[in-house]
């Protein structure tokens, strides 16, 4: 198992929400309804202002993350510091 997979395995709902909200600004606080982890990605559903959006986080070996919410794609940092 790669170190990247180990990091993903230890992320909890709060960590995932922090990664998303650090890279994307929301007018209201998003809530994670469901998520699943697989190798270098986390997929799930967010509720934002009463609407549901699918999200996907794809982690790269260079400590970056690609965030997709609905049709919006953002490339940002996965650093939690």
Curated annotation (Swiss-Prot):
This is Uncharacterized protein 81. The lineage of its organism: Viruses, Adnaviria, Zilligvirae, Taleaviricota, Tokiviricetes. It comes from Sulfolobus islandicus rod-shaped virus 1.
């Amino acid at each position: 198992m790669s170190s990247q997979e180990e990091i993903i395995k230890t992320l909890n709902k709060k960590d995932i929400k922090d990664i998303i909200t650090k890279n994307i600004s929301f007018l209201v606080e998003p809530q994670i309804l469901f998520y699943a982890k697989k190798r270098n990605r986390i997929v799930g559903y967010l509720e934002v202002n009463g609407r549901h959006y699918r999200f996907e986080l794809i982690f790269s070996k260079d400590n970056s993350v690609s965030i997709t919410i609905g049709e919006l794609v953002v490339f940002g940092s996965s650093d939690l510091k």
